[in-house]
Amino acid sequence: MSHDLDLWSSPSTPQRLWSVRKRDRELAAELLTLGEYGCEIQLFRDRGFYSSKRFETVDRALRSAERIVRALQAEGWTRST
């Protein structure tokens, strides 16, 4: 017997893209794929949720995350992963 709940798909497990440190602060980015709804970049500050943005494609999300980390590195943040 099929249930309506069987049709519900949950997001994938987030994939860590990078983390950066500056003094005692940490910022991290994760990629969350949402199936037919695209994907999302989630930012965490000191291990707490900070912000997210949804994208139509993984490629666009990855390019955005790379721009963010490059800008942070230009401001003195050090990449740790």
Tell me the role of every PLM-derived stretch.
Residues E26-Y50:
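Short aromatic-glycine-(Arg/Gly/Cys) micro-motifs in beta-strand/loop hairpins
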Residues Y37-E40, D59-I68:
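Short, surface-exposed linear segments at secondary-structure transitions and domain or protein termini
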Residues M1-E26, D46-S51, E56-V58, L62-R63, ...:
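Negatively charged, low-complexity tracts enriched in Asp/Glu with abundant Ser/Thr
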Residues E66-R79:
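Short arginine-rich
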